[in-house]
C-alpha cells in the first residue's frame, strides 16, 4: 500500500494505492463557513461524504444516496464531555428512521455534579420508547421496553452488576474477586440454583470454567498467554500449537491425529491439512491476490472454487465446481 498526499491544511487529498493499483482517494476540506467536509472515493468511483458541522452534527451521505445525520447535545451533568446524540437515517426513496435520546438528572446540590439523586434516560426509536431509571441510593437501574417488560439491575460502587431481575425468571447474581474479575453467575436459589463459576491462574488468564452440572473445562497457556491445552470434563485433552507469528499451526483433538494449518508470508491461511483418511490428497489450499483477497480454494478432490472481482476489488461472483 502506497500513500500520496497533496494540498495544504485548508484542502488536502490522500491517495491510497494497493499492490494491484486500486486507488482510493481521501479528500478533507476545512470549509470557510466552518465545519469540515470529508470525501472518500473508492476504486470504483463511488463517493461517500461526511460533513462535520459547527453544531456538533455529522452528516454521512452514502453512494446510494442514503443520508445518516447524527447530532450531539450536552449531558445535563458533564456537558459535551459526555455528549448524548440523536440519529436520523433517510433512504433515497424517502423512508426515515429516527433515534432520539434524552436524559434528565436530579441533583441535591446544583453545584455538585456527583450529588445525583435520580436519573432518567429515554431512547425513542421511531416513536417507540425505551426507558432507563437509575436510583443512586439503591444503586438500581430499572429498564422498561415499549411493551412494558422490565429488567431491574443492581450494581456495586464500582459499577459492576450484582443482581439482575427479569419478570417471570429467577434472579441472577454475579460475584467478583478482589481484582474485579467475574467469578460466578448464579440463577435461582436453594436446590434449584444454577451456578457457573470461573477461576483464574496467577497470570490472570481463565484457568477453568465450571457449569451448573459441575462439569469443568480447564485451560493451560504458554508464556505469551496463548491456550496450549484444553482439558475437558472427562479429562480428555485438546492441544494447540502456534507458528512463530502466533497463528494456530495445529489442533489435536482427544485421541486423534492433529489438524494442521499453514499460512502465507502475510499470515493468511494457505493450507488446511486434516488427518490422513486414505485419499491421495486430503488438504485444502487457499490462494490470494496481492490485495489479500481470496482468489481460489482448491479442495482435496482437486476441484476449485473461484472468486471474481471488479476493477475496484468488489466481489462479483464465485464459481462452484459441479463435478
What are these regions (language model features)?
Residues 1-42, 46-62, 66-211, 215-232, ...:
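Beta-strand elements of repeat-based all-beta scaffolds
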Amino acid at each position: 500500500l502506497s500513500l500520496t498526499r497533496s494540498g495544504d491544511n485548508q484542502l488536502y487529498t490522500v491517495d491510497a494505492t494497493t499492490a494491484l493499483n486500486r486507488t482510493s482517494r481521501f479528500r478533507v476540506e476545512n470549509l470557510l463557513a466552518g465545519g469540515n467536509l470529508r470525501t472518500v472515493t473508492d476504486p470504483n468511483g463511488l463517493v461517500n461524504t461526511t460533513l462535520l458541522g459547527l453544531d456538533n452534527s455529522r452528516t454521512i451521505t452514502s453512494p446510494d444516496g442514503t443520508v445518516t445525520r447524527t447530532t450531539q447535545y450536552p449531558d445535563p451533568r458533564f456537558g459535551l464531555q459526555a455528549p448524548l446524540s440523536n440519529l436520523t437515517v433517510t433512504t433515497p426513496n424517502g423512508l426515515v428512521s429516527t433515534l432520539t435520546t434524552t436524559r434528565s438528572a436530579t441533583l441535591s446540590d446544583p453545584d455538585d455534579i456527583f450529588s445525583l439523586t435520580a436519573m432518567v434516560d429515554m431512547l425513542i426509536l421511531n416513536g417507540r420508547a425505551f426507558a432507563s431509571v437509575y436510583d443512586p441510593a439503591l444503586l438500581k437501574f430499572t429498564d422498561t421496553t415499549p411493551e412494558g417488560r422490565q429488567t431491574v439491575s443492581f450494581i456495586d460502587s464500582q459499577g459492576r452488576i450484582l443482581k439482575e431481575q427479569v419478570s417471570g425468571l429467577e434472579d441472577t447474581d454475579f460475584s467478583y474477586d478482589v481484582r474485579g474479575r467475574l467469578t460466578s453467575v448464579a440463577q435461582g436459589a436453594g436446590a434449584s440454583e444454577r451456578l457457573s463459576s470461573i477461576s483464574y491462574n496467577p497470570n490472570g488468564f481463565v484457568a477453568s470454567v465450571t457449569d451448573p452440572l459441575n462439569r469443568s473445562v480447564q485451560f493451560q497457556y504458554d508464556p505469551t498467554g496463548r491456550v496450549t491445552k484444553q482439558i475437558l470434563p472427562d479429562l480428555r485433552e485438546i492441544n494447540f500449537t502456534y507458528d512463530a507469528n502466533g497463528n494456530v499451526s495445529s489442533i489435536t483433538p482427544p485421541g486423534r491425529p492433529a489438524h494442521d494449518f499453514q499460512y502465507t508470508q502475510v499470515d493468511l491461511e494457505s493450507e488446511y491439512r486434516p488427518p490422513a483418511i486414505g485419499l491421495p490428497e486430503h488438504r485444502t489450499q487457499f490462494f490470494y491476490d496481492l490485495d489479500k483477497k481470496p482468489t481460489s480454494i482448491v479442495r482435496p478432490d482437486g476441484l476449485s472454487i473461484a472468486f471474481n472481482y471488479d476493477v475496484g476489488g468488489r466481489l462479483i461472483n464465485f464459481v462452484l465446481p459441479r463435478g
